[in-house]
A protein has these predicted regions:
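Membrane-proximal, glycine/serine-rich, low-complexity loop/turn segments characteristic
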Residues: 2-8, 14-17, 22-114, 118-131, ...
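Short, solvent-exposed beta-strand-terminating loops
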Residues: 194-198, 419-429
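Extracytoplasmic gating/loop element in the C-terminal half of outer-membrane beta-barrel translocons
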Residues: 224, 348-358, 374, 753, ...
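Extracellular/periplasmic, surface-exposed regions of secreted and cell-surface proteins
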Residues: 309-318, 323-328, 334-337, 345-348, ...
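Conserved active-site-proximal loop/helix segments of enzymes involved in bacterial cell-wall
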Residues: 652-656, 769, 817
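C-terminal extracellular loops and terminal segments
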Residues: 665-674, 713-732, 771-772, 776-791, ...
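Calcium-binding motifs, dominated by EF-hand helix-loop-helix domains
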Residues: 759-763
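Acidic carboxylate motifs that coordinate Ca2+ or other divalent cations, activating on Asp/Glu
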Residues: 766
Length: 937
């Protein structure tokens, strides 16, 4: 059944890609207005047949679709509102081609999604200001505050950022109005239930003890558990002396609530446009609590956001913008830390100790003094409070009375944040009662401590950003011309470090002839103060062109094609990663030296890692080639992009340097690599009677190659990293297990194999397994990631479905969660560990024999532990109903919509041991079922 569902999901994704809508390069917008006219309606409550060219946001300006040369992805903010997420980045998956997402942690506040754009982590720009701190990006926005997401992919679209242009840009534009004219107020209330997904299942006490005895026998030791004890574990006759604790069920709740309330007000008048938003959300954690405590110990995350965006026409030529945002966050967790508790859940076996003893005290042993339950409810709590604000002030002056189409702009932004931690953590009493039941021989394994009440500063951050620009926009006959010259100054300071300053001058020139030919050139000269003098500044140029073939005379008779455009761009871009003044040699306290006959040590100062005064900005040469196609009255379209990024001056430590120096070598600009790939979007929208429908698909591929990394000359070609993918998994190639028929096969140096141990391929044929037999063991195919969306609307009902997935993704599953009894002979074991080698399971075993001692041979990094973590996920589903306005009291309520949505609803993957994204045993991802209503007043 699972294979059938997986096949059906792949078919749906393929069909969506072939016949989809809403490609992220273009956005379908109604002719009458490109803003949302009804905050209570779904994105399908808009005309789907008639469209006009959309002005897309580009860096420091706008550009019409027909003049576009750059490679840009676009997403209407409305598309994110169906995702019941508490961190904005968790809603991006599957929407934008070229943007790879991975969420490896599901914890409230900290469960943000990592983003990768064509192999690099993109810079976040919000309302024109670069943001480096998640406080001002993922955690400072909710979907209802967003007007659009713009993804700047190629070098030409980002080159004006100079030494910050290499990684691409995810540009967020917040709303400045809610309606096409007049004013409106809307309120949305929603609440949902979270439940953990993809957690490993630990063994029962009986299975654990049986496997433990087997491991001791394989290590030549006597059994640890007698048959009487095994029977007691299986029968559960004495839960105190022979516990069988499901720690996950004991520590974690089946589900946890989350809620969000949003009040928005907006207006659009001749001289003023505004958007005001007040948002509160709360996300509870999964931990159980003890009613005996007078305080909460569960994870709890609350966030308050206030946003005010105002645009004012002071006169016909002068416009002012004022954006204010305030962000307050409270985060509570158990005193021992939520991460520590989940680590214990992965490491504590079911028979380690009783949850509580028969006297009601916490249980514990010498081997397991800290039970997951005691750590969750008995260690007090820690509370973090964060307060952040940002203010943007902008002025735009038109200078048409001097030079037609000219203007000047100024933007000033100031953003401070402050976080403090209140520590009320403590220890607890835990006791071990011996298996004899002798209550007079009780061992205390943990002792209670006083509960402090201390406050410490966790972090300070402030950013000042200043931007001055002037430009010209002119059109005459068949010519369109625009130009901009811009100077920027970005000063940020974190905690007690010295300020980091980015500053530069940039320009862009765009010319269009006869709506057929478009050319664009841009450049930036930028600097960073943390490089050595002489290496702080560099110049970054870029250029591109596009050709609208559908406007050529030989295409005029074609009524089917509405758009056919070729695009190409090339740019030199940079990535400033200066570190903290690493060009300056540092010294620190060293070991004590003894002089003379006295045994008194004298303090010393030692040289730190070698400095590199020649360190410069990492760079890349980016090439992009694109095709844009729209057809059938713009009901369908296809966009294709090919990119190639040749990176050089990449920072790395030399691999060919001698290790006898006695000091760490510095990072140097010697690395070279290449990223390339293809991105395809397709779309279709139409109506069938009263049914409106849309279907979309996007798929992206990215591959990488190491071109140079200064590795030592390898004796065998298969050992080289050069020519293989960047960050490729390397290790030994597993070749099954040793059995009585192959015990003389090549083995690890100094190791005598036993039946059931891992056998490795002797790649160089010398009869010995050593470092000379290590090679690439991961998948070297291009990484594929994709999204597919289906939208339906009829008779007030609407539905949106989003699938998202990844192919050709390998993970390395090594660590304490993979290897049983790997903590000095202790530790948890999981259901998949039962697939170990025994003489009876020799033909089906997927893991080596179990042992108590750390058998190095069996736990080496090898292909045995490389898993295919490709997956397809039903990422989001929403069903809504918009009440007919005719039956509403129009004097009070102008619109009402009810909705139910869900996130992470189903996952289909070959990897069964855990969630394919969150496989390291961290706070689990959650399936969310959410419902609510939106009211427009």
């Amino acid at each position: 059944m699972r294979k059938l569902l997986l096949s059906c999901s792949k078919i749906f994704v393929l069909c969506s890609f072939l016949f989809g809508i809403f490609p992220d390069t273009y956005a379908a917008v109604p002719v009458q207005d490109s803003t949302r006219t009804d905050t209570t309606s779904s994105s399908l409550n808009e005309p789907l047949q008639k469209f006009q060219p959309l002005k897309l946001n580009v860096l420091y300006g706008e550009q019409t679709r027909d003049r576009l040369v750059q490679s840009i992805g676009y997403l209407d903010g409305k598309r994110l509102e169906s995702s019941p997420v508490t961190s904005l980045s968790n809603a991006f998956a599957g929407h934008l081609s070229g943007l790879y997402t991975n969420q490896s942690n599901g914890a409230p506040r900290y469960g943000v999604t990592s983003l990768s754009l064509r192999g690099r982590s993109p810079l976040i720009v919000i309302d024109g200001v670069p943001r480096y701190n998640e406080v001002y990006s993922e955690l400072s926005l909710n979907p209802e505050q967003i007007e659009s997401i713009t993804l700047l992919k190629d070098g030409l679209s980002t080159v004006m950022l100079g030494n910050r242009s290499m990684d691409g840009v995810l540009m967020i534009t917040t709303r400045n109005k809610s309606v096409s004219s007049g004013s409106t107020v809307s309120f949305t209330a929603q609440g949902g239930i979270q439940e953990a997904i993809g957690m490993r299942k630990g063994l029962s006490s009986f299975d654990y003890a049986s496997l433990y005895n087997e491991a001791r026998a394989n290590s030549g030791l006597s059994p640890a558990f007698s048959q009487t004890q095994l029977d007691a574990y299986r029968n559960g006759t004495d839960p105190f002396l022979y516990p069988n604790v499901d720690w996950q069920k004991t520590v974690l709740r089946d589900n946890a609530p989350q809620m969000r309330y949003t009040l928005n007000a907006g207006g659009n008048y001749t001289n003023v446009r505004y958007f005001l938003s007040l948002d509160y959300q709360n996300q509870s954690g999964l931990f159980r609590e003890d009613d005996a405590n007078s305080y909460g110990t569960n994870v709890d995350y609350s966030r308050y956001i206030f946003r005010s965006n105002i645009e004012l026409n002071i006169d016909k030529n002068l416009t002012a913008n004022l954006n204010l945002v305030g962000n307050i966050q409270d985060f509570i967790q158990p005193g021992s830390g939520y991460g520590n508790i989940f680590a214990l859940l992965q490491a504590t076996p079911s028979n380690a100790t009783a949850v509580t003893n028969f006297r009601g005290t916490f249980g514990g042993t010498r081997e397991y003094p800290n039970s997951p339950y005691a750590e969750a409810v008995g260690t007090g709590y820690i509370k973090n409070n964060l307060q952040a604000a940002a203010v943007n002030v902008g002025l735009t002056q038109k200078l048409g009375n001097l030079i037609e189409g000219s203007w000047v702009k100024a933007l000033l932004s100031y953003s401070p944040s402050y976080e403090q931690r209140i520590n009320r953590s403590k220890n607890y009493n835990a006791y071990n009662y011996p298996v004899t039941g002798d209550t007079n021989n009780v061992l205390r394994v943990s002792t209670i401590s006083e509960q402090p009440n201390s406050t410490t500063v966790q972090g300070r951050f402030q950013q000042t950003y200043l931007e001055l620009s002037t430009g010209l926009d002119r059109s005459w006959k068949n010519n369109d011309f625009s130009a901009i010259v811009l100077a920027s100054y970005d000063n940020s300071q974190s905690n007690n470090t010295l300020n980091e300053i980015y500053q530069g001058i940039s320009t862009r020139l765009s010319y269009s002839f006869d709506k057929r030919f478009n050319i664009e050139a841009a450049g930036a000269y930028s600097a960073n103060n943390r490089f050595a003098p002489g290496n702080q500044a560099d110049f970054y140029p870029g250029a591109g062109a596009s050709w609208n073939l559908h406007n050529e005379s030989f295409m005029q008779g074609n009524k089917f094609l509405n758009e056919l455009k070729l695009r190409a761009s090339y740019a030199k871009v940079g990535n400033a990663d200066p570190g903290y003044y690493l060009w300056r040699q540092t010294y620190a306290s060293g070991s004590a030296y003894i002089f003379g006959t006295a045994a008194t040590g004298t303090s010393s100062i030692a040289q730190g890692a070698l400095a590199n005064p020649n360190r410069v900005v990492e760079k890349a040469k980016k090439f992009n080639l694109g095709l844009d196609l729209a057809f059938s009255k713009q009901r369908g379209w296809i966009n294709v992009d090919y990119f190639n990024s040749s990176q050089y001056d990449m920072l790395q430590t030399r691999g060919s340097s001698s290790v006898i120096l006695g000091s760490a070598y510095p990072l140097e600009n010697i690395g070279k690599s290449r990223y390339s790939g293809v991105e395809i979007n397709s779309g279709w929208s139409a109506t069938a009677g009263k049914l409106r429908y849309s279907i979309s698909g996007n798929i992206s591929s990215v591959s990488s190659r190491v071109l140079f990394n200064d590795e030592p000359t390898q004796q065998f070609a298969y050992m080289a990293r050069t020519g293989n993918p960047v960050n490729q998994i390397r290790g030994y190639v597993a070749d099954g297990f040793f059995n009585p028929g192959n015990l003389t096969s090549p083995r690890l140096e100094g190791f005598t194999p036993t039946e059931g141990d891992v056998r490795y391929k002797d790649l160089n044929g010398d009869g010995i397994i050593n470092v000379m037999d290590q090679t690439v063991i991961g998948n070297d195919k291009p990484l594929l990631y994709f999204g597919a969306n289906l939208g339906l609307q009829i008779a007030g009902f609407d539905m949106n479905v989003l699938f998202q997935g990844v192919e050709n993704r390998d993970i390395l599953t090594i660590g304490n969660y993979q290897f049983p009894f790997n903590l000095n002979g202790q530790g948890q074991a999981f259901s998949y560990n039962l697939n170990r080698y025994t003489p009876a399971t020799a033909s089906t075993a997927t893991l080596p024999r179990v042992t108590i001692q750390n058998e190095v041979n069996n736990y080496l990094t090898s292909s045995l532990y490389v898993q295919d973590a490709s997956y397809i996920r039903l990422k989001n589903l929403e069903v809504g109903y918009t009440v007919n306005p005719k039956i509403l009291p129009s004097s009070v309520i102008r619109g009402l919509r009810l909705f139910v949505n869900g996130q992470n609803l189903a996952t289909f993957s070959k990897y069964k041991d855990a969630d394919p994204e969150n496989y390291m045993g961290l706070y689990p991802l959650q399936r969310v079922i959410n419902g609510g209503l939106s009211i427009k007043l």
